[in-house]
């Protein structure tokens, strides 16, 4: 099964393949820009498409306005457990976003490890909807971690054009 969909940007196809078996279920880290105005059903549809029918143990997001709000609503609509991990801007200033992104990824990996068994791998799927510097930080961090992750780690960048392509006519 391929982890690539029409929504995946061309750069994602160049990512190294995971050294782990195909995951049977997932922990999802999802994020995107504060200005993303896609309706929740489009977000939900893309999350379901990227999960490829695998059960979702948990969906983690940054709790910001825009994409994160739509992601949280989509998880609720889909019946997926979800948790927000907001950035601590007061404590960390401009570094809060990258720190939060690292925490999201590490929490997802820990959760996947705790649910994995020798016969059933739980993977982490990072789904990045269109966004700015914060989303780019999440993508960069995730891509750097693919080969060193103790669990399967898959990274998908959703193309900005998907929003208009999926919109109802």
Predicted segments, located by residue:
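Acidic/glycine-enriched connector segments
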Residues: 3-29, 34-168
